[in-house]
Amino acid sequence: MAKTPPLRPHGNMAKFLAALGICSWLLVSATAHNCQHQHPKAHEVVHGVRIQLADSEDDSAGDPARHSVRRRSVAAEQPLRILLVYDESVYRLEEEKFNLINDTVLPEAVQFWEQALMVRETKGVIRLNRKCDSTQVYVKNGHTHCIDHCKATTMCGEVQVPDAHLDVCRVCNATGQNCRIDSNTQPGEGIENADFVFYVSARQTQRCFKGLTVAYAAHCQQEAALDRPIAGHANLCPESISTKPQELQTLISTVKHEILHALGFSVSLYAFFRDDDGKPRTPRKLDTGKPYLNEKLQIHQWSNETIRKVVRENWSVRGGHVNKVVDMMVTPRVIAEVRAHFNCNKLEGAELEDQGGEGTALTHWEKRILENEAMTGTHTQSPVFSRITLALMEDSGWYRANYSMATPLTWGKGLGCAFAMRSCKDWIQYNHARGRSIHPFCSKVKQDPLQTECTDDRNSVALCNLIRHEFELPKGYQNFDSLNHVKDGEEGFYGGSVSLADHCPYIQEFTWRSKNVIVRGSHCRFTENNPRPEKNFALESYGEGAKCFDHSESMWEERSCHQTREWQHWGSGCYKYDCFDGRLHILVGNYSYKCSFPGQKLSIRIAANGWLHKGAIMCPPCHELCGAQFAAQGKQCRPGEEPDPLNKYPRDNLACGAGSEKSRSVAIITAVLLLFGLRWGFS
């Protein structure tokens, strides 16, 4: 809807400042998918499921603890086999959503973990244990017995376990005597050719409404020999499942994330981790064979061999320093991987999340230092499963990891102990003072006109998520003593929009929304993110092979014979590129622009879609985008040289008559771009 334009002078002629509507589709959201994994309480998990490993004798023989250790050291390994069992609710999904989940999302997520993890080979069938009415049970000859009777139905999450998957009901009387098999039950056929049974439902439960949760999962039964989770459940929230192509990878990553909570990455499983010899990392009670119970959390308490508290002294915050206590995962492979990743040999382990409450804290990696690792507590952009996460799964004692399945994690890589062990305020302040880059953090307050940047991997157009909060942040999360264009004394209101990252501001992908519906995203890879032609002022080209390039400091401009439009949203864009003749070539419209040296300003002047587009793109270092390709060819980027003369580049012109030139007006596109933390959830 057009507004009456005010007048302003421009040279010798009056030009119209026409606000061509505040476009609702330009509403910008920095997206965060929050996980609030609801770990099962100790009494909700069924223990003692009997399995037999392929190279062991009868599982019932001998001392179970000693037997486990011996098996652990010699066991053969095979790829993890996950059996999916659908609840009837899955079949009630809308056809498009069912096909997406059944044909793409679940198969890809399951296949990933089947290729990434190996387990000890088993033989025979798996029969799950029946649940008891009482939390008190007796264990006789390695079998779990209920008091007097078993529950009529055994649930795993929202799904009823089929009778065919269940063992007989074993009971004792209240004093632990007269132990027997309930004659009214029969053993089911059991589960063959599987190491983990995953029951899947699709119900719009109350948990689905918490933060627009997409899915949640947990384990429900553990085996007797090594305590490995052997059955679990996942619920998919129908109303939160998106079928948009540009959201598919995030949806798949969300389901992978949830599966991993059920397989081992859970606060309710840490106490059951074992070392390479199969010995428990956490001491066990003699009477139950289980770790001690944390009465407050209602989970089994791990030892310092798994998670240890570390005090960070002199943690820099606004106006001074505080002591910060962090929980560190300190298992051997995790320590080795985080030290190698950050290039910090004194790092004690991998920091766990300390915010978000029960379900987020301790059961995810710390967002501040492992931002887009998929097992942090919120997905904000390009989630990856790194070697650090695979190392944790291997350190559980239940799996061997195939590290070739890990995706490189660039966040924080090689940045040293100053990044991994100190506050983001320290990092920003130290590097600012020395004229160095403060990436991956940033200090540009989001304000109009909106100026975008590129993520460090150049995969997305992005924004600095530094915003003014409604209330002053807690002292421990105030990360600035001063900020450009912010009044003294108000710095405590400013911080990153992602609370789990300790409000440290960083460059983040975003989405354009219309009436809270995603129109397009900012990831360069997806063709669906291309702007409509009439909105493509910077001639961007999204799709496979596209990368993000910075614009110059000047706004892009569109001209016709009658009007000039300047877009007050600029800073970066997605473009295709080529690598040849030792040079990076950026493709804009139908033209190719050669980069002769880093920081070169490529002036663009191209007629397209009825407008003359004018702007500039900055050349990155050639090796960033072409180095690997040239190296594979036995070549390399050529040294910098003088750029070609301007007349070597295309410079389109308008063909206008004299009359039309005099009547030209200017329209400034002043779309109000609101950055807000719309929280999508996965749990």
UniProtKB/Swiss-Prot annotation:
Transmembrane segments: none annotated. Keywords: Cell cycle, Cell division, Cytoplasm, Hydrolase, Metal-binding, Metalloprotease, Mitosis, Protease, Zinc. GO terms for biological process: brain development; cell adhesion; cell division; centrosome duplication; chromatin remodeling; electron transport chain; germ cell migration; gonad development. Binds 1 zinc ion per subunit. It is found in: Cytoplasm. It comes from the Eukaryota. SUPFAM superfamilies: Metalloproteases ('zincins'), catalytic domain. One of its GO terms (molecular function) is metalloendopeptidase activity. The keyword Glycoprotein does not apply. Zn(2+) binds at residues 257, 261, 364. GO terms for cellular component: cytoplasm; membrane. Its main location: cytoplasm. Its EC number is 3.4.24.-. The active site is at 258. InterPro entries: Peptidase_M8. Belongs to the peptidase M8 family. This is Leishmanolysin-like peptidase. It comes from Drosophila melanogaster. The gene is Invadolysin.
